[in-house]
Each structure stands twice: as structure tokens, then as C-alpha cells.
Amino acid sequence: DIPVEAIKNQINKNLYGEVKILEIEEVGKEFNSRFDAQRRTYLYIMKKKEEITPFEASYIAGIKGRVDGKILEKIMKVYIGKHDFSSFMKKDKALRNTIREIYDVKCVSDENTGEIKIEISGSSFLKTMVRIMVGSALAVYFHERDRDYILKKLKNPDVGGRKILAAPEGLYLYKVDY
């Protein structure tokens, strides 16, 4: 038997700077990393398009203007709770259950860098759900949709309706709790 700490060190020696194993622990053979997760947290980073450097372009989503994190957070708090998120997913005929629970949403503005960081924690997420949630919230923020647009979509799910999709750059699976 190899100690788990030795496995972690060996893996980290072969990884590059962008990926690193922080913690490792032994689990039973029946453990499933996808289905045994209790909480997932996604991080979405964005800033005004004109302020993104060429080095950031693949890692940060560009948006049309500066955003006040407190106002955006207030808009996004409506997602918290257990809802039918079928209006916030890419169509999937095989999927039977579109009920998901969002535990928390945080939006933080960094005045120095102009970045907005959004953390969304939930039980699990549907395909493209986070990008549609962020895209919809930004549409409300920039007055492209009514203030109650998100609430209407949560109360009256519209599977085939047009989705407002935020850019893929800037989206990260940030943390998984077991």
C-alpha cells in the first residue's frame, strides 16, 4: 500500500502550475465522485471587454460595461432555493428531473482590477445552467429584461424558450464538497 500523501506528491510533481492536488484521502470502492458530491460551487469571473488583456481573454468573460457586484448579487439572490431550472438549461430529452437547489450566490466587485467574481453553490447543476443564470442576471442588470424576468422563468419553466447565455470564458468548477 502506498500512502495517500505520497500519491499526492507524485501527481503534483507531474502537473503544471495551473492544476494542483490540494487534498487527497482514501475512500471506499463504492465512492463515486459525481454522485456522492453534496455541494458544488462554480466561479464565474468577468469584466468590461475593453479592460481585458490578451493574457486574460481565455480566462475572463468580457461584458459590455462595468457591473456593481452588490446590485448583481441582489438580482441573483432570487435563484436561491429549490426550483425547476428547466428554463436555465440546454435542452436534454433524456433528463427527467430538472429540480435543483441553489444554496448561495455571492458577487464580489474588485475596484482595482474591474473584475466581478460570482460564486454559485448548489446541490447539482444542469447543462449550461450557470452560464444561463449569469446571462439572464446580466440581461436584467443591463435593463434588457424586466426586473422579474428570472422569477417568471423559475415559476413558469419554458424548456424550449430562448436562453440568454453568458460566455464560456471565466466559468470554473471551483469547489466540490462531499
Could you tell me what each predicted segment is?
Residues D1-Y178:
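Structured-RNA-binding interfaces characteristic of tRNA pseudouridine synthases
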